[in-house]
């Protein structure tokens, strides 16, 4: 008998992966968490039936959400990660010696515990001495943080439903602005522009960021296991433009080995398809 994981992208579209084994299933006070093993994508973790991370393509998401802001400001020292319980974003941040402090705020401890056991490709740097883990609500953590206390905030959240909903609110973005330094950058995952539900949330988030931050841009990556494969990220800043202020030479001198991100991809990721540009221009 064959076992398949199937995720509903829309009422009319589903995405399936043939599964060898269902490695873990559990329910925290917030959400359902599952881990599967497959031939094509290796181990993968889902939350409430939605794909979060796979062994085969996780590097794309984690490199793009991390290296784009870092290559824009190589002087970043204090970083706040909201969500990111699998640890992949922290892993990429830990590669920068200039970073002194990484605070990771994950509402669901079970996500971290399960990732440590099954998704070690991502969670391998959560014990870095610069990393502090906080198991609490990210919205409240940001609200209580001191002014100008972080150089970079990465919102590595689930979709804007359930526990992740508040991380797409105007009040949350205003608090992020307040706790960022003058050269501070906020990056978030911004859903897909392709299917209507994802596109609606993407437009809402982008509109809110534009109202709060002087610089607000959108960039993209191809992530095969996310709905449509076309995924967007938001980049918001008080001063720094990710294209004009890209420190290509400085970043390349670090000689970081990557699988997806490079200096050309950095620039190219901001060159959006026409239909996405038009969506973002809609009031």
From Swiss-Prot:
Top-level EC class: transferase
Alphabetical keyword list: Cytoplasm, Polyamine biosynthesis, Spermidine biosynthesis, Transferase
Active site: 156 (proton acceptor)
Gene3D superfamilies: Spermidine synthase, tetramerisation domain, Vaccinia Virus protein VP39
Location (main, coarse): cytoplasm
Domain PABS: start-end pairs: 2-238
PANTHER family named among the record's database cross-references: SPERMIDINE SYNTHASE, SPERMIDINE/SPERMINE SYNTHASE
Assembly, per entry: Homodimer or homotetramer.
Matching HAMAP family: Spermidine_synth (MF_00198)
Name of the featured protein: Polyamine aminopropyltransferase
Species of the source: Clostridioides difficile (strain 630) (Peptoclostridium difficile)
Gene: speE
